[in-house]
């Protein structure tokens, strides 16, 4: 499986506490920060909850 590059494109400020916690748990801080995470169910579930705040692309 390929990894996922997750980039924060909108701020997590003024969002629900659960959404802010997910952003922090993924290792995202400021807008435009990116992380590479494994493509598994846990990561995809977290992305589902904050899909409106991030962009996701597959990397090999």
Swiss-Prot record:
SUPFAM superfamilies: Ribosomal protein L30p/L7e
GO molecular function, one term: structural constituent of ribosome
GO BP terms in the entry: translation
GO cellular component: cytosolic large ribosomal subunit
Record's keyword annotation contains tRNA-binding: no
Subunit architecture: Part of the 50S ribosomal subunit.
Family: Belongs to the universal ribosomal protein uL30 family.
NCBIfam families: rpmD_bact (TIGR01308)
PANTHER family: LARGE RIBOSOMAL SUBUNIT PROTEIN UL30M, MITOCHONDRIAL RIBOSOMAL PROTEIN L30
Full protein name: Large ribosomal subunit protein uL30
Species lineage: Bacteria, Bacillati, Bacillota, Bacilli, Lactobacillales
